[in-house]
Amino acid sequence: MENPIVSWLFETDAVRVCPEGQPFWYTSGKLGPFYINTQFLYGSEEAANALLTVIEQACAGDKLRFYDKVYGEIEKQLAACPIYRQLIDLMTEAARKMDVDFVSGGERRDFFFSMPVARKLGLGHLSIFKDLSSVYTDANGVSMPAGQASLSGKRSVHIADLVTVASSYIRAWIPAVEGLGAKIAYSLAVVDRDQGGSDI
């Protein structure tokens, strides 16, 4: 059975192949012949860039209002884009099998996927920012500084856009969650490049 995500990546032009002799540098510091823009599964490059702009502006503002600003845009796109909606449904079904208390996602592209999955599961969402600050939004949509959310002893599924060697996990996501006394029990990525990240 063909994986629909592979088809959707090509349908949304999310896969870019490098020019000969000019490999891409990945965030992980590795070189590679192709680049995957998983955020294009949001519907298109244009739609993804628009949401990235909203995310960047919301990150720069009051972080307690971050979730509402970003999720409002995501909700509209879920209604408008069948590929994005079907992807979130697939990810939600995978996450539903995991014994977790909340969903976490990291700035920026993880939010495309972590926020709607948390909402569909009826779980809270931990938004982790690049400065390692975090905001927890409970299942009712109420946001608070994560330190006030009583997450000690809780387990999350961290939902990522893409994993190569899991450098963002090591550098930021795991320390942020563990700093709250919680644990990333599972990780769910749209794409795992199978370059060692799943071993972390």
Predicted region positions:
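PRPP-associated nucleotide enzymes
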Residues: M1-I200
